[in-house]
Amino acid sequence: MKVGVALSGGVDSAVALYLLLKEGHEVKAFHMKTKEDEFFLKKEIKKKVCCSPSDTADAIRIARSLGVEIEIVDVREVFREKVIEPFKRDLLRGLTPNPCVHCNRYVKFGYFMDYVLSQGFDAFASGHYARVEFSGKYGKKVIKKGVDGKKDQSYFLARIEPWRIEKLLFPNGIYTKEEIRRIAEEAGIHVAKKQESQDVCFIPDGSIENFLKDEGITLSEGKVITEKGEVVGHHRGYPLYTVGQRKGLKIEKFGERLYVREKIPESNVVVVSGLEDVFFSGLIAEDPVWHVEVPEEFRCVCRVRKKSEEAPAVVRVRDNEVEVRFEKKVFAVTPGQIAAFYDEDTLLGGAIIKEGIR
């Protein structure tokens, strides 16, 4: 089979490429450029991020060492349109967006995948820790969690278009991270011990404040208030805070620990409350993407952030929204984040959280 492989320059995609070669597939590597190289050279990179010049150099070296052709694909225009601009817009709306999910939907498993398939390839592969398997229950190929629970990346795939699943290969999904590194070492792949990407690729210094400043947006300090309107401190700009956050708030002496309850962009106010008030009994989410057919009401487990615990829930589908009711209250349901739905280890789909239900 002819397979186009997304080669980031990291160990995961390198091993995915290696495994597909071992299986006898005809393989070509493709590397995305989301930002110009100069951007990374001007930034203080505090955490490892993807798509940097060093990643491009590593991707080229990996491909050459494995005897595979590599093509660099410029996705900067679509990346700005579909990821950076919506991210900026959502921050100013008071949301906490997840740019990686949007990148997967519109860029990596959208524009980039379309480009690869247009070159005559039968399948598109990446180094994601997830699996694609045929489901007898649903009568089609589905995305399942990777066997390494700590590294499972299915959450980030919750909103890709369902028709694409038939064309996907995730060779790493049946391995743990430790096994992937061991395979890389045994194969002599030079990035076997390379640090993992940990931050948003277009914010390499980890500062949303600096990102917005670079985009021409200056944040204003505002009041931190309780539900009763009592001023308890000040914030540096509401886009810098998220529901459930406690650190970073300039709160004057108060009788209890306070957490971000909500943000009100119109008045540049951050509302705080006690811990009890940042647990939610449910949520409303919009623009759902379903990988399988689902009934109007069904039970499943829901994940509201990548690292959140899975919460058993009842989901009711209504037009372009879903209402989710949890069996037990869930911490920090955050507008702008993704609610991903699972039937055991099968990913059913995902929707954008509109509001939490207390």
From Swiss-Prot:
Q: Where is this region: Interaction with tRNA?
A: 151-153
Q: Which CDD domains does the record associate with it?
A: MnmA_TRMU-like
Q: Which cysteine-cysteine pairs are annotated as disulfide bonds in the entry? A: 103-201
Q: What class of enzyme is it?
A: transferase
**For this protein, what reaction is catalysed?**
S-sulfanyl-L-cysteinyl-[protein] + uridine(34) in tRNA + AH2 + ATP = 2-thiouridine(34) in tRNA + L-cysteinyl-[protein] + A + AMP + diphosphate + H(+)
InterPro entries linked to this entry? MnmA-like (IPR004506), MnmA-like_C (IPR046885), MnmA-like_central (IPR046884), MnmA-like_central_sf (IPR023382), Rossmann-like_a/b/a_fold (IPR014729)
Give GO MF terms, alphabetically. ATP binding; tRNA binding; tRNA-uridine 2-sulfurtransferase activity
Pfam families, alphabetized: tRNA_Me_trans, tRNA_Me_trans_C, tRNA_Me_trans_M
Main subcellular localisation: cytoplasm
| UniProt-annotated binding residues for ATP | 6-13, 32, 127
Annotated compartments: Cytoplasm
Q: Could you list this entry's UniProt keywords, alphabetically sorted.
A: ATP-binding, Cytoplasm, Disulfide bond, Nucleotide-binding, RNA-binding, Transferase, tRNA processing, tRNA-binding
Residues carrying the site annotation Interaction with tRNA: 128, 337
Q: Where along the chain is the active site annotated?
A: 103 (nucleophile), 201 (cysteine persulfide intermediate)
Q: Which GO terms describe its cellular component?
A: cytoplasm
Could you mention a single GO BP entry for this protein? tRNA wobble position uridine thiolation
EC number, as in UniProt: 2.8.1.13
Give the similarity note.
Belongs to the MnmA/TRMU family.
- Role: Catalyzes the 2-thiolation of uridine at the wobble position (U34) of tRNA, leading to the formation of s(2)U34.
Per its record, how is this protein called by name? tRNA-specific 2-thiouridylase MnmA
What is the scientific name of the source organism? Thermotoga sp. (strain RQ2)
Q: Which gene encodes it?
A: mnmA
